[in-house]
Amino acid sequence: MNNKLYGIILCFLLALPAWKLGKFFPLVGGPVFGIIIGIVIAILLKNRAKFDSGINFASKKVLQYAVILLGFGLNLQTIISVGSSSLPIIVSTISTSLIIAYILAKLINIPTKIVILIGVGSSICGGSAIAATAPVINAHDDEIAQAISVIFLFNVIAALIFPTLGDILNFSNKGFALFAGTAVNDTSSVTATASAWDSIHNTGTQVLDSATIVKLTRTLAIIPITLFLAVYNSKRSSNVNNFSLKKIFPMFIVYFILASIITTVCNYFIEVGVITENISITINNVFSFFKHLSKFFIIMAMVAIGLNTNIKKLILSGAKPLTLGFCCWFAISLVSIGLQKILGIF
């Protein structure tokens, strides 16, 4: 472990300012600042060899730990009861993004792993989906950084223009919550977009609460998609006859599901009064700590990814991934608006 310590400490220390900057500029978010800081420090870093094993550990294992802890933010009971009404639109937008990504991959010849990362990032939950998918498909750090950067760009655009667009289209509060929850990629940007609407229309946290639940419902798609990709990736890269689900099954996704179940069961016991008030406060504080730790681990992993990123390669290969990201984002927005219009939601 000692040979990893230097790199882990470096990533931890660099993640601190990235996390703080993410608090000040939520539209950008800590993960993006983490990548930027990592890229800058990588240019300045000398005697890099002693940091490499720790940096690689942070970019892979810490990323998986972040996904596991993410499960403690998912109360499956609440999501199922409230989010089920948005399911048709969620399924349609996810399907649209993945189909668009697949078609464009063939038309403009984008590397498969970048296509997958941008496709799932656009359709599910931005950086968290990319974090969950990257280890499953063995994505390189350059590819992860590129996908995160593309998702970030369209998150910012969405947060800036969607509240005004919602007014132009005469969205109801319910309609805009559903639009923000399905058409904005990352949870932090969904929060920013929905909060902006609440501020403009003096609706307290009504739209924010609903949009967050829609977003968390989308997040559940991480589970089937990562499992499918694990099977697909294994069959592509090895002999089909030697294929074993047990060998390729991403265990961190199992722990993610387990964390979600633990959260759901504990919340149920709190609601029915089985658990005393003092214990319930402690449990909620622990879950809150895990959720915050998950966010910090993602930032720490993004710092490591930034440190491993070839900036020249990232810039030179940027046009096609941007085109893919725009097409996925635009198509998701159109489908969300169109289906709401057809279903009479707004």
Swiss-Prot record:
Membrane topology label: Multi-pass membrane protein
Keyword tags: Cell membrane, Membrane, Transmembrane, Transmembrane helix
Entries under Pfam families matching the protein: Cons_hypoth698
Listed transmembrane segments: 5-22, 27-49, 62-81, 86-108, 115-137, 147-169, 216-233, 248-270, 283-305, 315-337
Compartments where found: Cell membrane
Primary location: membrane
Cellular component aspect of the GO annotation: plasma membrane
PANTHER family in the cross-refs: INNER MEMBRANE PROTEIN YEIH-RELATED, UPF0324 MEMBRANE PROTEIN FN0533
Entry's family note: Belongs to the UPF0324 family.
Protein name (record): UPF0324 membrane protein FN0533
Classification of source organism: Bacteria, Fusobacteriati, Fusobacteriota, Fusobacteriia, Fusobacteriales
